[in-house]
């Protein structure tokens, strides 16, 4: 979970609209974020394996 100060910084209005980027809603990681879920790949995998994401199934072939 990101620190309180970091969360407050995210909420502030941005100087430049172009510089906005996605962050994981759970841990705050800026890279490898799935827009549809708002989660990074690490949190997505963890939550999917725990069954917390409905409709997500592990693929095997």
Curated annotation (Swiss-Prot):
Its cofactor is Zn(2+). Pfam families: Ribosomal_S14. The keyword Metal-binding applies. InterPro entries: Ribosomal_uS14 (IPR001209), Ribosomal_uS14_bact (IPR023053), Ribosomal_uS14_CS (IPR018271), Ribosomal_uS14_sf (IPR043140). Gene3D superfamilies: 30s Ribosomal Protein S14, Chain N. GO terms for cellular component: cytoplasm; small ribosomal subunit. Binds 16S rRNA, required for the assembly of 30S particles and may also be responsible for determining the conformation of the 16S rRNA at the A site. PANTHER family: 30S RIBOSOMAL PROTEIN S14 (PTHR19836), SMALL RIBOSOMAL SUBUNIT PROTEIN US14M (PTHR19836:SF19). Belongs to the universal ribosomal protein uS14 family. Zinc-binding uS14 subfamily. This is Small ribosomal subunit protein uS14. It comes from Pseudothermotoga lettingae (strain ATCC BAA-301 / DSM 14385 / NBRC 107922 / TMO) (Thermotoga lettingae).
């Amino acid at each position: 979970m990101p620190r309180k100060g970091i969360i407050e910084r995210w909420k502030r209005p941005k100087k430049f609209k172009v510089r906005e980027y996605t962050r994981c809603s759970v841990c705050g990681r800026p890279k490898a974020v799935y827009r549809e879920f708002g989660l990074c790949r690490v949190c997505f995998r963890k939550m999917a394996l725990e069954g917390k994401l409905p409709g997500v199934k592990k693929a095997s072939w």
